[in-house]
Every structure is written in structure tokens, then in C-alpha cells.
Amino acid sequence: MLTADDKKILAQLWEKVAGHQDEFGNEALERMFVTYPQTKTYFPHFDLHPGSEQVRSHGKKVAAALSNAVKSIDNLSQALSELSNLHAYNLRVDPANFKLLSQCFQVVLAVHLGKDYTPEMHAAFDKFLSAVAAVLAEKYR
């Protein structure tokens, strides 16, 4: 459960991410494909090479969804409902993969933000990503 402090910290973090979110989304996906190659199976029609336009485009979508989730933090289920339906019913993505992408996004933020990515931000963002993953997995039940 995200506290009021967590939400405040997330807003501060997302201000730092603004302007870089597309780049960070792309890098998180590229990192996931290298670190967890089994995730590539969900993208058989993509060129998965680093710098691929398809990966960049999907990274942009991931970042936009996270940005929307940050803005709609008090109503994640409604904000992510369409995305949850898409991943559960159409794409049939194993929900365990949401955690893998979350880990990769955490690494990207740590690399790019350095000391500005405080332990408090890391903890709040981890809780947030867990909440997002839980909402995305709701339709699987």
C-alpha cells in the first residue's frame, strides 16, 4: 500500500524522469531482453536488436503507461484497465514478466539518476511498480 509520503516521493521522482521517460522505457526493455531472454517470446514480430524502432516504440508505450499510472495513482485499476485486458486476454503475457521489467526499470533509473535516486525513491518506486504489476495481473484471476 502506497503511503502519502510514497506518493509525494513518486511525484518528485517522476519530475526527474520527465523528458527522459521514452529513453528510459526503451532502455528498460532492451535490458530486459538481454537479462531475461525468455521475455523475447512475447515479441516474435519485433526486431529486438538494440536501437530497434519497434523496441523504442514499445518502450515509449511502457513509459507512457507508467506516467499515466503515476498521475492516476489513487485509481490504478481504472487507469490501467485496458492495459490489463490487453495483456491478460489478447497477449497472454505471464504476469511474472511484469516484475522482470520492473527490475530493469529500477536499474535504468539508478544508472541515470545516480545519487539523485535515493533509497527512499527506490523503495517508493518499488512499491508503486508492485502495485502496477498487481493491477495488470488482476484480469488473470
Swiss-Prot record:
Record-linked Gene3D superfamilies? Globins
Which Pfam families does the record match to this protein? Globin
Q: Which UniProt keywords apply?
A: Heme, Iron, Metal-binding, Oxygen transport, Transport
At the top level, the lineage of the source is Eukaryota
Q: How does it assemble?
A: Heterotetramer of two alpha-D chains and two beta chains.
**Domain Globin residue range list:** 1-141
The record's InterPro entries line, in alphabetical order, gives: Globin, Globin-like_sf, Globin/Proto, Hemoglobin_a-typ, Hemoglobin_oxygen_transport, Hemoglobin_zeta
Gene Ontology MF term list: haptoglobin binding; heme binding; iron ion binding; organic acid binding; oxygen binding; oxygen carrier activity; peroxidase activity
Asked if the keyword Transport belongs to this entry, the reply reads yes
Q: In which tissues is it expressed?
A: Red blood cells.
Q: What does this protein do?
A: Involved in oxygen transport from the lung to the various peripheral tissues.
Q: What PROSITE patterns would the database entry show? A: GLOBIN
Q: Which cysteines are joined by disulfide bonds?
A: none
Q: What's the protein called, per UniProt?
A: Hemoglobin subunit alpha-D
Q: Which GO terms describe its biological process?
A: hydrogen peroxide catabolic process
Which CDD domains does this chain map to? Answer: Hb-alpha-like (cd08927)
UniProt binding sites for heme b? H58, H87
Family that this chain belongs to: Belongs to the globin family.
Q: Name one GO cellular component term.
A: blood microparticle
